[in-house]
Amino acid sequence: MSASKEIKSFLWTQSLRRELSGYCSNIKLQVVKDAQALLHGLDFSEVSNVQRLMRKERRDDNDLKRLRDLNQAVNNLVELKSTQQKSILRVGTLTSDDLLILAADLEKLKSKVIRTERPLSAGVYMGNLSSQQLDQRRALLNMIGMSGGNQGARAGRDGVVRVWDVKNAELLNNQFGTMPSLTLACLTKQGQVDLNDAVQALTDLGLIYTAKYPNTSDLDRLTQSHPILNMIDTKKSSLNISGYNFSLGAAVKAGACMLDGGNMLETIKVSPQTMDGILKSILKVKKALGMFISDTPGERNPYENILYKICLSGDGWPYIASRTSITGRAWENTVVDLESDGKPQKADSNNSSKSLQSAGFTAGLTYSQLMTLKDAMLQLDPNAKTWMDIEGRPEDPVEIALYQPSSGCYIHFFREPTDLKQFKQDAKYSHGIDVTDLFATQPGLTSAVIDALPRNMVITCQGSDDIRKLLESQGRKDIKLIDIALSKTDSRKYENAVWDQYKDLCHMHTGVVVEKKKRGGKEEITPHCALMDCIMFDAAVSGGLNTSVLRAVLPRDMVFRTSTPRVVL
């Protein structure tokens, strides 16, 4: 990149940072937490194998399978991940002119990406020939004087041409790209340094990135203070590389995440509720600076990069999260609807239960859902020991769980809060739930479940005041409560064992939770989950954890709406 182009590119980046600062967040703790999870759970011998296969000039289906398997292992270990989300862009916050621009730019971006991945220059073949046929083809092309026979694809910065000889090219989608947590973990483990040393090195790199794109000279100077940066290979292309390669781009991205309050684009989180605002802000910068989609195949400029990443998933951290589970490309997962005027459901942008009600959608359970709930509740034994726990306030609960150890049956569901200010406090110091994850919860389920509990039931709990207030607010004074009143330490004795055994039962507690210490300061703790609390309280009383298989009473499509209207953008 020439100096003038680099200056213009960074100007775009800086302007996007300023305009999108409201969507940026401090994610250093979450990135480091994911890196620690990878350090403890990832097979680094397999990481080394994948790094080796990524250096091969030609890679086949077996190599792709190993890459995909390792990517899946990483995805299973980290919390920062993007999820599949189909976005339909309609007139709303975005004007019809905005939609026309987005539609045109997505089409241009599609053409550029396809040309970059499958170049059309003479002698280039990216089809499905076998390795033997490719060798034979190379020899024949050389024989007739076509020098292109020596190349099966575009050479990277290190001069090595690498080809994927696979049957299904779609399996390559979303298997590349770098993750700061993975870069941090690989630097730490394979560089044989302390995690903190890697964090400090990347932080300094990130600080330079606030003022310019770090280059080879910058890296050489930083290496004098941080020898771990010697592992960064500045010749590594950012095209079609795995997240296990030590490219300068991967290190810079990780460094951006180490900064608190840096308004770095890498820290943006997008959701169906914020996507319209993000795209609107991007288009504002595009118009002000004349940003555009380049016709030249190759690396993406800042506008191309952010447009692709935002439109790929629409739910997660577009720059830094694991996207292994996402299928399709940006132009497939975000569709521009130029025909609909969006009038039938000009709902609140947060897509919450209240906005859905105002748009004409049912607030409570339907008759068929009530009948399904009634049948499901028959799985509970009215006379069996039953634990109950809630998160949130009794007048505004956000998570409720009931658990019967004898059968392994449990009821576990969530509710959107009405007091957002109090919710954020509770999230910080107790449950760590992201309010946007509650927008898809089923309204009215709390009242319906409590109403369906057996008459004169006896419920055991750790602390009964809040649960009693909740039950009485729903007219269930007939339910008896037994408060075991254990100390905080005793009640959470089996906390780690419970999370280790049953962590797959709940993925809602994504935030960082801290506890204030008596002598000042704060300490990070495990988020409180109503279901996990029920299980660990029972283990504390029983003197051990029963690792039986647990069974959900409520079907998932009752806990979370699966047929919510598409978001109007």
Swiss-Prot record:
Encapsidates the genome, protecting it from nucleases. The encapsidated genomic RNA is termed the nucleocapsid (NC). Serves as template for viral transcription and replication. The increased presence of protein N in host cell does not seem to trigger the switch from transcription to replication as observed in other negative strain RNA viruses. The keyword Hydrolase applies. Mn(2+) binds at D389, E391, D533. It comes from Lassa virus (strain Mouse/Sierra Leone/Josiah/1976). Its EC number is 3.1.13.-. This is Nucleoprotein. The keyword RNA-binding applies. Keywords: Capsid protein, Helical capsid protein, Host cytoplasm, Host-virus interaction, Hydrolase, Inhibition of host IKBKE by virus, Inhibition of host innate immune response by virus, Inhibition of host RLR pathway by virus, Interferon antiviral system evasion, Manganese, Metal-binding, Ribonucleoprotein, RNA-binding, Viral immunoevasion, Viral nucleoprotein, Virion, Zinc. The gene is N.
